[in-house]
Amino acid sequence: MAFTKELWQSIEPIYAAILRHPFLRGLTDGSLPRESFKFYAVQDALYLREFARALSLAGAKAPEDDWIIMFNEHAAGALKVERSLHESFFQEFGLTHEAVASTPMAPTNLAYTSYLLAVAYGRPFHEALAAVLPCYWIYWEVGKELERVSSADPLYKRWIGTYASEEFGSVVRAVLAAADQVAASLTPLEREAMRRHFITTSRYEWMFWDMGLRREAWPGW
């Protein structure tokens, strides 16, 4: 069995909880409050900037030239997606680039990105790869599932299409192939470290959608 399949089996309960989450169900049935989606989209833009940094750090540690290229291209791609959010969603919300950039990170967002950067900076390549993998893989699987159900809301349908696309699928498959190739030469302890990071950041994926639904804020004092 491919190692990535083992990884996925380890998060099946988390993924099932993600699909049941009211945020995602609200995207398909149109019941998600616009303010929750707006909050999520702004936090996602802030997340993508830090995710790009984590990808660049992972690329710097990659043992294969093709992976160095791949992760640096993906880092650039994450920043392009962040910019496209301004063009496709934030203008509709009346948000300027400055307004988004000056928005504080919500607690969950700060915790998630801090974890990613700590692993990407301080741990070996295989661990960094495992930590960033859920953001790719879970979004692709969620996108495909939500596209199957679709949405009557044009705005939410557009968001769903971004992550269900074959173009994004090709990106994810390349990262999965790298993870399997790396894991093949690792010790059981090294693979277990990959699994721990993969599970942790998968949990953060659930928490991120929950953060968006609740419009999570820091305490007021």
Language-model regions, residue ranges each:
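Polytopic alpha-helical membrane-helix bundles and their juxtamembrane interface segments
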Residues: 156, 182-186, 221
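Acidic, low-complexity proline/glycine-rich segments
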Residues: 1-24, 166-177
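Alpha-helical bundle segments that constitute or directly flank the non-heme di-iron/ferroxidase center
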Residues: 12-17, 32-61, 80-81, 130-140, ...
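Active-site-proximal alpha-helical scaffolds that flank and shape metal-associated catalytic sites
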Residues: 66-170, 199, 203
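Short, charged/polar, low-complexity loop and linker segments
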Residues: 23-29, 116-118, 181-188
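Acidic, carboxylate-rich catalytic segments that either coordinate divalent cations
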Residues: 194-221
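Long amphipathic all-alpha helical oligomerization modules
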Residues: 168-198
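Structural helix-adjacent loops and short alpha-helical linkers that scaffold large soluble proteins
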Residues: 62-67, 187-188, 192-195, 220
